[in-house]
């Protein structure tokens, strides 16, 4: 492992001293290591990134999401040093950075391949690449009103309901927006997709888990509605068609996981006790 990328979120508290320390830790493990620094993911999706052996993300979970989308087609593994608030995906704290880098070069880690989603818009040129690691969300526009949605799974009608929106999430995204919408926490290596309605106007409409190979069609039934598509809570697009198709992408996010990190411990400390942290916000 000689080619290392570092993707820095410039909105976070990352001093030059921190970056110098990381360079030092890397070169202590491999004096010949070549380090390429990216700022706010700019240039990360270029073909040259294919040569990287791993990318370290300095930021929060949102920075991980952006990095995953940029690198998906290159199969480059990533891991995060948390400089955000929650740090569920960016699970390495700054004080553990040196240990993580040492384990990286010793090969003391595993790689988890996480499902990603793709979205096709009916009748729209596919030049836009709608990839998501967490979720793809279809909601109403600016007006505060509910919208009527019809859901088809593998071209078979599933249900129709009115709601604020619809979330289609991966197992990775099950601890994000869909959790707030009443969806279950899904173990990350399961091959499933989740549909979670947002504030449905019915007591009988609940989240559902589907086979990971399912094709999900969401139709907006009122012609005067201009739905909005949101990718991982970061990319935003007004949709001029009334139907979107969401399915599993051929690309996966490759997350580096170190052996001293336990999923359930992270779940307990980062999610279960989140309410205590929020009291002071």
Curated annotation (Swiss-Prot):
Names of the cofactor(s): a divalent metal cation
Catalytic residue positions: 61
EC number: 2.7.1.23
Record keywords, A-Z: ATP-binding, Cytoplasm, Kinase, NAD, NADP, Nucleotide-binding, Transferase
One biological process term in Gene Ontology: NADP biosynthetic process
Chemical reaction(s) catalysed: NAD(+) + ATP = ADP + NADP(+) + H(+)
Family membership: Belongs to the NAD kinase family.
Protein name, per record: NAD kinase
Name of the gene this protein is made from: nadK
């Amino acid at each position: 492992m000689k080619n290392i990328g570092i993707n820095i979120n410039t909105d976070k508290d990352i001093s030059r001293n921190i970056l110098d320390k990381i360079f030092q830790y890397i070169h202590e493990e491999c004096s010949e290591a070549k380090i390429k620094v990216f700022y706010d993911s700019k240039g990360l999706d270029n073909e040259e990134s294919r040569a990287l052996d791993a990318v370290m993300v300095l930021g929060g979970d949102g920075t991980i999401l952006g990095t995953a989308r940029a690198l998906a087609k290159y199969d480059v593994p990533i891991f995060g040093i948390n400089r955000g608030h929650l740090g569920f995906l960016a699970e390495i704290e700054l004080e553990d950075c040196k240990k993580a880098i040492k384990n990286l070069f010793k090969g003391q880690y595993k790689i988890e391949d996480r499902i990603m989603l793709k979205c096709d818009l009916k009748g729209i040129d596919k030049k836009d690449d709608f990839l998501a690691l967490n979720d793809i969300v279809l909601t109403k526009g600016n007006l505060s009103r509910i919208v009527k949605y019809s859901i088809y799974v593998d071209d078979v009608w599933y249900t129709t309901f009115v709601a604020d929106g619809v979330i289609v999430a991966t197992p990775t995204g099950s601890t994000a927006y869909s959790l707030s919408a009443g969806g279950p926490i899904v173990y990350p290596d399961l091959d499933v997709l989740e549909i979670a309605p947002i504030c449905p106007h019915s007591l009988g409409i609940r989240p559902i888990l589907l086979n990971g190979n399912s094709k999900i069609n969401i139709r907006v039934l009122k012609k005067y509605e201009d739905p909005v598509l949101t990718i991982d809570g970061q990319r935003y697009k007004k949709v001029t068609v009334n139907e979107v198709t969401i399915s599993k992408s051929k690309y996966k996010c490759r997350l580096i996981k170190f052996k001293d990190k336990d999923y359930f411990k992270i779940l307990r400390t980062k999610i279960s006790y989140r309410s205590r942290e929020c009291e002071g916000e």
